[in-house]
Curated annotation (Swiss-Prot):
Compartments where located: Cytoplasm
Binding site residues for ATP: 159, 161-163
Region annotation Domain II: where it falls in the sequence: 75-114
Main location: cytoplasm
Entry protein name: Chromosomal replication initiator protein DnaA
Similarity field: Belongs to the DnaA family.
Protein keywords: ATP-binding, Cytoplasm, DNA replication, DNA-binding, Lipid-binding, Nucleotide-binding
């Protein structure tokens, strides 16, 4: 082949650039790089899994056609994530197919496989008021298994981070104690394996598998409700591990006392250690989660778009991140830049219809005061220190922009100030907005807070 892989990929990109819109090309191809080429395959590095999936599903045929046109050969395109190794044909075995698994051998010779998502670590977990205690408890357990809280019971709604914390515990333990036998399993899979073990007359093997571990992580324990035989088996598994100072971590969508048809003896054991909950994230945490997601996936998302999404989706982290992905995908398919307007279009079909509230000066005062850590009375008082005067000017500017109130009326709401004071504040902020990008971000964030209530 005459071209080396850099030349070949560069020519391919030029070809694709002619076929695609500028936003689509910049979104999906600008961060790609060739890393290896054989007689049949060209391996391309991509920044994140979302890009990999998108290129595979949407552009693979176009890329391979362009490659053939340029090189004269039918090359297959293969995308690699950062750190992902090229799979050779002779290495086609189970461990290669499932790189996320970590295998350990017990003294009885049975294989322990821990299924941990490499993305779910303490480093990627965003801490906020709604999950701070659960995070601290999980880290304490990871640092000192069976010494801090045993069992650790984490409960909360769907998509709030319970599974993330459980995987993070597993990763932390294995990174500090590589010889530990760590098993993560859902209660549904535990039940299915138990049923199969009874059917195949392999209950001894089943018990050896789960009673000879150092860390047992059981997700969604509420699904054991009503399954008497499985509860009986788990009861004895729990006892064996606890008596041998082995750590047990359990998650559920509700606390033990609210799980229906759960045997009292199991319920009481779940309450032996520490019970902690995770609530829905507040606005600040939702913004932080989206920023972290964008950073980890190497996505350039404008701040006002992140704030908008965080304001609109307040249910759980899974839907929040799903909203971000939807905006990215929509902007690419519609050949539009990622802006707040694009985000509004992308999310309009999945967001509940909200009747816009009539904006009031009082609502603006409360929101601005909260944003700057002040009291509403501070905005109405005669204080002229910058820490108060600047937020007051912003509040007056927004009151003039977003309400139907007259200048004298706005002045009255701010401690009986003259209408010329309101006019001066409005003009000053309007002028500063043309020069200071940071002020634009501040105003956008406050507007999003105002419309998000």
């Amino acid at each position: 082949m005459s071209e080396n892989m850099e030349e070949l990929w560069s020519k391919t990109l030029e070809e694709l650039k002619q076929q695609l819109s500028k936003p689509s090309f910049e979104t999906w191809f600008q961060s790609t790089e060739p890393v290896e080429m054989s007689s049949t395959d060209l391996y391309i590095s991509v920044p994140n899994e979302f890009t990999k999936d998108w290129l595979n599903s949407r552009y693979k045929n176009s890329i391979e056609n362009s490659l053939k046109k340029i090189s004269g050969k039918q090359l297959k395109i293969k995308f690699l994530l950062p750190g992902e190794k090229i799979k050779m044909e002779e290495q086609n075995n189970e461990n290669e197919e499932k790189p996320e698994s970590t295998s350990k051998k017990s003294s009885q010779g049975s294989e322990h496989t821990t299924w941990l998502n490499p993305k779910y670590t303490f480093d990627t977990f965003v801490i906020g008021n709604a999950n701070r205690f659960a995070h601290a408890a999980s880290l304490a357990v990871a640092e000192a298994p069976a010494k801090a809280y045993n069992p650790l019971f984490i409960y909360g709604g769907v998509g709030l981070g319970k599974t993330h914390l459980m995987h993070a515990i597993g990763h932390y333990v294995l990174s500090h104690q590589p010889n530990y036998r760590v098993v993560y399993i859902s209660s549904e899979k535990f039940t299915n394996e138990f049923i199969n073990a009874i059917r195949d007359n392999k209950t001894v093997n089943f018990r050896n598998k789960y009673r000879n571990v150092d860390i047992l992580l059981v997700d969604d324990i509420q699904f054991l409700a009503g399954k008497e035989q499985t509860q009986e088996e788990f009861f004895h598994t729990f006892n064996t591990l606890h008596e041998n100072d082995k750590q047990i971590i359990i998650s559920s969508d509700r606390p033990p006392k609210e799980i229906p048809t759960l045997e009292d003896r199991l319920r009481s054991r779940f309450e032996w250690g520490l019970i902690t909950d995770i609530q829905a994230p507040d606005l600040e945490t939702r913004i932080a989660i989206l920023r972290k997601k964008a950073y980890l996936e190497k996505l350039d998302i404008p701040n006002d778009v992140i704030v908008y999404i965080a304001n609109q989706i307040d249910t759980n982290i899974r839907e929040l991140e799903g909203g971000l992905i939807r905006v990215i995908a929509y902007s690419s398919m519609a050949n539009k830049k990622i802006t707040k307007e694009t985000a509004e279009e992308a999310l309009k079909d999945i967001l509940p219809n909200k009747q816009p509230k009539k904006m009031t000066v009082e609502h603006i005062q409360k929101t601005v005061a909260q944003y700057f850590g002040l009291k509403v009375d501070d905005l109405k008082a005669k204080k002229r220190t910058r820490s108060v005067a600047f937020p007051r000017q912003i509040a007056m500017y927004l009151a003039r922009e977003l309400t139907d109130s007259s200048l004298p009326k706005i002045g009255d709401e701010f401690g009986g100030r003259d209408h010329t004071t309101v006019m001066h504040a409005h003009d000053k902020i309007a002028s500063d907005l043309k020069k200071e990008s940071h002020l634009n971000e501040t105003i956008d964030e406050i507007k999003n807070l105002l419309h998000g209530d």
